[in-house]
Amino acid sequence: MSDPIKVDIWSDVQCPWCYIGKRKFEAGAAQFGGDVEVEYHSYELAPDTPVDFEGTPLDYLAQHKGISLEQAEQMTQTVTGIAASVGLDYHYEHIHQTNTVKAHELIHYAKAKGRQLDMKERLLKAYFVDGRHVGRIEDLADLAAEIGFDRADVVRSLEANEYLADVKADVAQATEYGIQGVPFFVIDGKYGVSGAQEADTFANVLAQVRDEKAAAQ
């Protein structure tokens, strides 16, 4: 039995393409059919954003990208349509724009307990689908408790910045790799795939890596 193929994914909780890319990658991995080991890494698209951003996601987009509110609305409508095509029901009207550093710390907390993928999925769904706040410690603790974590221990960890160094290390590694946007997939430590590519693309790269590994044995 061959070892699983390692896939490292840089991603942000409030990146709409990261959730879409997650679904497309999952479809590609299923299509590939072999063993794949996924690890998520922190990437902050807007580290200067306050925890409680005053304004709507459209206000944020317009400010951040230097575009009009009409253009921002068009962008969100486009991405909502693409999300729907992979089974995701985005609700931009309910989104709480925030700072995601604590959400990233929580993902590392979950990783230490062997449940990183569950926590990542819950946070993405909370942000884009459920209209939950993913920047405040109390809200994050609620979300963690919903999937079985000890709420008080999550609060303790986040208040102590227990995994902040891990978040910073991920961000530093992204810079070292030259990653300038997410999602970004590093497959088998050597192939980089940028953006929410189609499932076929992921399946093909995974198959290529499997064949290369087999040929090298």
Walk through the language-model features, giving the residues of each.
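Structural alpha/beta surface segment adjacent to cysteine/selenocysteine redox centers
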Residues: 22-127
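C-terminal cap of thioredoxin/glutaredoxin-like
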Residues: 2-36, 40, 107-217
